[in-house]
Every structure is written in structure tokens, then in C-alpha cells.
Amino acid sequence: MLQISEQKYGDIYVITLQNDDLILKTTNFGCNIISLYTKDKNNIFGDIVLGFDSIDDYKNQDKYIGAIVGRCANRISNATFSLNDKEYKLAKNNGPNHLHGGINGFDKKIFKYKILDNGVEFFYLSKSGEEGYPGNLKLKVSYILNENSI
């Protein structure tokens, strides 16, 4: 049976999804996966995710550990791209380049969320012009906990 709990840390929530085989902790800040506990061969739970000890560490990191990134994952050279014969200038956060969505990419956003029967869905609206990107983008991230998988 799935158990779901929420803990509040200011404007950030940690959501825990737990069943007999897995414990997933995630947050509405960057949709970070904080931890994933699974059983070893001796039936003992252990965390298999690289992460931090506190929410503040996630807020202050610059390595994207556990977070989703975007609008673009990877580096955009010279922080510019062309679309339909128009050049767009993006936020520079990696020397002259744009990396993983920029200075305030998805990894730094606080998402709205909805608890589901079997998991959690996160929602965010990236508005046109955010970090230099054109057009609105509706984002949905779902973490669904099945018997022994997410």
C-alpha cells in the first residue's frame, strides 16, 4: 500500500512516496529527487541517489544534482539560437554560453503540485521571455511509484 506524506520548509515542500519496496523523497523545488531508498539483498533499505542533507543545500547548489533542467539540457554556444529566421539571446551562465536552462532554469523554480493515488505531479508555466526563450511552455513532471519501480 502506498503512503504519501508532505513536509513544509518555508515555501518548499518535500513529498515522500513509500510502499513496501521503495521510498522516494522529492520536492517541488526543481522537482529534485532527494532520495530513493530500495532494499538490498538483506532486505535493508539504502539510499541510492546522490544528494544533499538539507533543502538549503539544494537551493544553493550549482551542479543540478537531483533536479530537472530546462528549457534546454546541455550547453547552447554563445547563448544564442535561431528559430524561424529570428535570433534569440539567452541568459549566460556558463562563461559566454547558456547551460541547462540558464541562471534561473527549471532547477531553481518552485513548482505547483498535485498528489495522485500513486504518486505526485508537478506543474510549471515558463512564460515567453523567461531566460530569453520564446513562447509559453507548460511543463508537467510526474513521479509515479509502482510496486518496485518509479
Predicted regions and their residues:
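Surface-exposed acidic/polar loop and edge beta-strand patches at domain peripheries
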Residues: 1-150
